[in-house]
Amino acid sequence: MMNPPVKIGVNVFVIRDNKVLFGKRIGKVGHGTWCLPGGHFEYGESLMDAAKRELREETGIISDNLEFVHIINDPEEHTHYVHINFLAKDFQGEAEVTEPDKFAEWRWFEIDQLPEDIFSGHKKFIPTFLRKLTFVDKQ
């Protein structure tokens, strides 16, 4: 039996006023759970361009200033994902549901009060990363 292919995706931590943006998923995979904006690459796309595109497509938010955060290698029994994660602190626009077939809503959560039902593919790295962040943002 052949192993399934390794999937590579990008995710964006969108941070404002010590809050992080999560989308409530709908559909087959992860229905009812909360996740970061993100997705898969299009052919020929750079890491940064994929992250910017996914952020814009899913939320309507535009950011030209993403910071690389980390890469997570996440092999599981039936799937193997590599997550390439970015941070957006500088952005324009307000989060809106631009893909109603994928998301029910976008909501800001306090960094120390994350939702209980985080998407399984993100559970391993979201809380750990956010605990390490320190913000001084008094704009």
Feature names for model-found ranges:
Residues 4-6, 64, 80-82:
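Residue-level preference for beta-strand/loop junctions
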Residues 29, 33, 100-139:
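Nudix hydrolase/Nudix homology domain
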Residues 15-20, 29, 42-43, 88-94:
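Short, charged/polar surface micro-motifs in flexible loops or helix N-caps
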Residues 1-20, 37, 71, 87:
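Conserved N-terminal beta-strand and adjoining loop/helix that marks the start
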Residues 8-10, 82-84, 102:
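Residues that flank catalytic or metal-binding motifs in active/ligand-binding sites
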Residues 22-24:
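Beta-strand scaffold of nucleotide-dependent catalytic cores
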Residues 72-95, 107, 122, 128-133:
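Active-site-adjacent beta-strand/loop module that shapes the phosphate/pyrophosphate-binding cleft
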Residues 36-68, 86:
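The catalytic Nudix box helix
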